[in-house]
Amino acid sequence: RVLFRSVILEEGDIINVDCTTILNGYYADASRMFVIGRTTAQKQRLVDVAWECLKVGEKVCSEPYVFVGDLGNAIQKHAHANGFSVVRDLCGHGVGCHFHEEPEVEHYGHRGTGMLLVPGMTFTIEPMINTGTWRVFIDDEDPYGWEVISEDELPSAQWEHTYLMTENGVEILTH
């Protein structure tokens, strides 16, 4: 197992960098994947499918008044169709004056369920896509309490944007 505080990155590693910003009292959240040099075809495919899952979620939100379950269902179908799983223990979230607000934006689920995403809402889409099981744990030795590891310790990938739902669909706030 690799601990973030002591790791030396090596050729083929994939890493996620997740950043939160606060501007004028409002939060935004984003993460990006990086490939160190050349990696295996499987890891590259994982990174690519995780990006595609983010874009699938965006497409579902191209019009307002969609359910969180619509978004989650589409992401889950895309990940599974490509042989990957979607983490269920972590989800996207509303953002605003607080870092984590309603709604919880699950990246799996059933169409027509969950909160309705309406104009004026700000939220993240951040599917964590795993090579193996969807189950994860938080590393007990992580001093920040936020190093997430897949239960089977196989590679994971995650991209994230913060969005504003408008009358015309989502606007990406974290380009």
Language model feature labels by segment:
Residues 1-175:
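Active-site neighborhoods and metal-handling regions in enzymes and metal-associated proteins
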